[in-house]
Curated annotation (Swiss-Prot):
Belongs to the universal ribosomal protein uS14 family. GO terms for cellular component: small ribosomal subunit. Part of the 30S ribosomal subunit. Contacts proteins S3 and S10. SUPFAM superfamilies: Glucocorticoid receptor-like (DNA-binding domain). GO terms for biological process: translation. This is Small ribosomal subunit protein uS14A. The gene is rpsN. Residues 35-56 are annotated as: Disordered. It comes from the Bacteria.
Amino acid sequence: MAKKSKIVKNNKRRDIVARYAQRRAELKQIIQSPTSSYEQRLDAQRALSRQPRDASAVRLRNRDAIDGRPRGHLRKFGLSRVRVRELAHAGQLPGVRKASW
């Protein structure tokens, strides 16, 4: 079980990323565009650097949806490997079967 404060902090980051996502995408497009002038790129880079650090999606951490475990996250289920194993053995994940060959 992860600390509640870490889970809450990650959720706040997720909200901040969603709030700034469109503006960040616009600025990045200006920076990467070959048609934009040097001054436009410089202004876009400055505007991007003025945004909050937590507005970057790279700072998000994938966590287990049930207990917030930060490691061993399986995207397909949104759970950690430990939780997937427990739920699969209990038959609570539809369509998941133990391998047999």
